[in-house]
Amino acid sequence: MAKNKYSEPDYWSKKAFAENYPARSVYKLEEMNKKFNLFSPNDKVLDLGAAPGSWTVYVLRFLNKEGRVTAVDLKPLDSSVYDERLNFFQGDMFDKGIIKSVKELGPYDAVICDAAPATTGNKTVDTARSSGLVELALYYAQEQLKQGGSFVVKIFQGGDQQIHLNNLRKCFKTARAFKPEACRSSSFETYLIGLDFKG
């Protein structure tokens, strides 16, 4: 049976292990934050699709003691991800109870979402599912971001990327697509970024 090339450790996964992050995806967020100044040290940040927790850990390390993170995922966070400034809700992002609980801890300075659908290998199906997650993440952002806030969401290329980007431009003063260096060259994922939420 052929090996899954994604299971082979690469530069980024080795770096994540050495720096005590649960996954290599952290370096995508790090690059985007350095380039676009997504966060300030005392921010309240909502992390959707947070498991295993690399983005959560990165944000917690970036924030000061006044900062807070609310994280949501169907799966549990890695056992190493714990902090008094973290509130984690394990459940479906579509669930009304989850939406209510998240809203009670807001509003937020940034909404970030690295969620990906369960893939089928059918690009049409996978991009459609990814598009649904983008719509949900943008709903959270529109409902719970403070004016001037930031937004980042993963999207699979080849679907409704331009439609979503146009929707972001209605809500944010700046909106663009960006593919971090830490994305695998064979991956068709990229990120949509919204800056300075109009409110």
UniProtKB/Swiss-Prot annotation:
<feature type="binding site">
    <location>
        <position position="53"/>
    </location>
    <ligand>
        <name>S-adenosyl-L-methionine</name>
    </ligand>
</feature>
<feature type="binding site">
    <location>
        <position position="114"/>
    </location>
    <ligand>
        <name>S-adenosyl-L-methionine</name>
    </ligand>
</feature>
<comment type="similarity">
    <text>Belongs to the class I-like SAM-binding methyltransferase superfamily. RNA methyltransferase RlmE family.</text>
</comment>
<keyword id="KW-0949">S-adenosyl-L-methionine</keyword>
<keyword id="KW-0963">Cytoplasm</keyword>
<dbReference type="InterPro" id="IPR050082">
    <property type="entry name" value="RNA_methyltr_RlmE"/>
</dbReference>
<dbReference type="Pfam" id="PF01728">
    <property type="entry name" value="FtsJ"/>
</dbReference>
<dbReference type="InterPro" id="IPR002877">
    <property type="entry name" value="RNA_MeTrfase_FtsJ_dom"/>
</dbReference>
<comment type="function">
    <text>Specifically methylates the uridine in position 2552 of 23S rRNA at the 2'-O position of the ribose in the fully assembled 50S ribosomal subunit.</text>
</comment>
<keyword id="KW-0489">Methyltransferase</keyword>
<feature type="binding site">
    <location>
        <position position="92"/>
    </location>
    <ligand>
        <name>S-adenosyl-L-methionine</name>
    </ligand>
</feature>
<keyword id="KW-0808">Transferase</keyword>
<feature type="binding site">
    <location>
        <position position="55"/>
    </location>
    <ligand>
        <name>S-adenosyl-L-methionine</name>
    </ligand>
</feature>
<feature type="binding site">
    <location>
        <position position="73"/>
    </location>
    <ligand>
        <name>S-adenosyl-L-methionine</name>
    </ligand>
</feature>
<dbReference type="InterPro" id="IPR029063">
    <property type="entry name" value="SAM-dependent_MTases_sf"/>
</dbReference>
<keyword id="KW-0698">rRNA processing</keyword>
<dbReference type="GO" id="GO:0008650">
    <property type="term" value="F:rRNA (uridine-2'-O-)-methyltransferase activity"/>
</dbReference>
<feature type="active site" description="Proton acceptor">
    <location>
        <position position="154"/>
    </location>
</feature>
<protein>
    <recommendedName>
        <fullName>Ribosomal RNA large subunit methyltransferase E</fullName>
        <ecNumber>2.1.1.166</ecNumber>
    </recommendedName>
</protein>
<dbReference type="GO" id="GO:0005737">
    <property type="term" value="C:cytoplasm"/>
</dbReference>
<dbReference type="InterPro" id="IPR015507">
    <property type="entry name" value="rRNA-MeTfrase_E"/>
</dbReference>
